[in-house]
Amino acid sequence: MTHILGISAYYHDSAAALVKDGVIVAAVQEERFTRKKHDASFPTQGINYCLGEAGISLKEVDYIVFYEKPLVTFERLLETYLAFAPRGLRSFIAAMSAWLQEKLYLKTVLKKALAELGDCKTKDLPPLLFNEHHQSHAASAFFPSPFDEAAVLCMDGVGEWATTSLWSGQGNQLTPHWEIHFPHSLGLLYSAFTYYTGFKVNSGEYKLMGLAPYGEPKYVDLILDNLLDLKADGTFRLNMAYFNYATGLTMTNKKFADLFGAPRRSPESPLTQREMDIAASIQVVTEKVVLRLGNTVYEELGLENLCLAGGVALNCVANGRLLREGKFKNIWIQPAAGDAGGAIGAALSVWHQYLQNERMVRKPDAMAGSYLGPRFTNEEIETYLKGPAVQAVYDYYSDEDLFGKVAHILAGGNVVGWFQGRMEFGPRALGGRSIIGDPRNTTMQSVMNLKIKYRESFRPFAPSVLAEKVGDYFELDQPSPYMLIVADVREELRLPLTPEQEQLFGIEKLNIPRSQLPAITHVDNSARIQTVHPETNPRYYQLLRQFEALTDCGVLVNTSFNVRGEPIVCTPEDAYRCFMRTEMDYLVLENFVLAKTAQPQREQDQKWQEEFELD
C-alpha cells in the first residue's frame, strides 16, 4: 500500500491531496479552513484533513511531492530581470527580498513545516520530491480522465517557464511535445485585462468573462494589432512594451492605458460601457487563441480526446466553443484546473511516472465528482445546532421525506442553503456546498446577487440539471459535471424580445427575462451548465428529481455557498453563520431543515462583511 501526499502552496490557492495506490482519497484547499480566500500559506489544515481521511499519520506517507520546482522559477526571475534591465529595479528588490528570505530555501521551509506538522525530525520525513508546474497540471488533467489516450493542453499564467504546453497521454505515461515560455502568456494577458478593468488578478478573471456578453468586441483588432502577435497555429507573442508584469509591480503600464484611451478603472467604481466592450474583446481574442491551439493540437497528434488544465481551462465560454467548433470528439477538464489541482497532479505523477505503476481508467472519471473534501454526520451537525452558542431551531427529516420537503420549499420561491456530503475540490460548488433556487423565478438572479451573495448585479448564475435531461434544456449533448462548459439555452425555451428590449445596450440588458428559465439564462442566452449524476451525488440528484416531479422542471439555480470575498463554506458552523448573515430563507444541513424565521434573533453585526476582503 502506497500513500502519496501532494502539496501546492506559496503562490495562491494552496492545497493538499492524498493518493492511495493511485486512487484520490482526499483533496482540499487551505482557504476552506482558514477562511481566507485564495490562501497561499502552507496547507497545514488541508494536510491534516487528508491524513485523517486516509486514517494515517504523516510518518505512514511514502512520498511527499511539491507541485513545482522553485529553483527553476528563481532562474526564470533572474533571467527576466536581466533581459529587461534597467527596468524593474523596485520590483527586483521586492522579489529578491522574498526569495532570499524564504522561497529560495523552499525545500528546507517545507521540511520544517512538515516535521512540525508530523511531530518528527526532518530526517525522519518521507522522501520529498518536486514536480514541474506544467507536468503537475498535465497529470491532473490526464490521469483522472476517462481516456486511455489523449492530447493534453495546459494553459495558465506561468509555471517555472512554461505558460502553454502540449502533452500526449497514453496509459501511465505523459510525453511533453512543446511549450510557450514566459513572458508570452495567454493567462497573464487575460489577467492584465482583468487588472485594467478594475478587477482582482487571480480572482476576478471569471467576472471579466461574465461581463463580456454585455459589451461589443470593438477592440479585437486593436489587441491583435498592438498587443498580441497571433499565428495561424495559435502560438503567440505579446508586445511587452504594453505590460508591466514581467518586471513591475502592476500588470499594465501607461502605454497600455493610452492605447485604450483612459486609465485603469478604479476597483469598486461604477462599470461603464468601455469596460464591457473591453471584456467582450479580450474574451473573443482568448477564444480565438484557444480554438486555433486546439485545431493545431488535433492536427499534430491526431487524437480524438483532449484534456485541459491550467487557469485558462476555467474559461468555460472558451471551453464551450472548443467543444462545439473544435475537432475533438471528447473533452475532459480537470475541475480544479488552477494551482490547487497541481497537488493532485503532482501526487499522480509520482504514482504513475516516478513509480511506474499501471493506470486503471475509471468511468466517468477518477475524480469522484470532485467531492473530495470533508463531510459531517447528522450527529456532528446536531451537536453543533444544539450548542449553547447557537440554539438553532430545526426539523429532522428522513431521506424518504427530505427531498420532497426541500423541493416544495424551492418551488415556493425560497432560497436554500444546501449542505450535503463531501465538500467540493476546486472553485465551483457542485451541490455539496451550494445555494440553490428555482430557475423559473424572474427575480431569483437579482435577489441572489444583491441580498444573499452581496456581489455585482451583472454576474450570472449557473444551472444544475439532471444529466439525462441536459439536451431538453440546453444545446449540449454530453455531460458537464464540473460546470466548465457554457452552452446556449435551447431556442424553443427562449422568450421573444420586444422591439424596445432589442434596442437595449450594455447593462440595460440586465433583468430582461430571456427564457423560461430566466434565473440561469445570461444576456447572450448562454448558461454555465452542471449536469448532475446519481453515481456521484445521489442526494442532489434526488432533489432535482423531486423538484422535476413537482414543477416539471429538472433544473435548479446553483451558486456557491458563500458571500462575496468568502471561501465556500466547509463546516456546519460556516454554513449556519452565512445563512444567518444573509437573506437566505432556509438551510438544509444533511437531514436537518432550518427556517430563517424560526431562528433565535441575534443582534445585527454590520461589521461582519469586513471579515472578507472583496474579490
Swiss-Prot record:
State the family named in the UniProt similarity comment for this chain. Answer: Belongs to the NodU/CmcH family.
InterPro entries, from UniProt? ATPase_NBD, Carbam_trans_C, Carbam_trans_C_sf, Carbtransf_dom, NodU/CmcH_Carbamoyltrnsfr
One Gene Ontology BP term is: biosynthetic process
Q: What is this protein called?
A: Uncharacterized protein sll1178
Identify the PANTHER family for this entry. Answer: NODULATION PROTEIN U (PTHR34847:SF1)
Recorded GO MF terms = transferase activity
What are the alphabetically sorted keywords of the record? Transferase
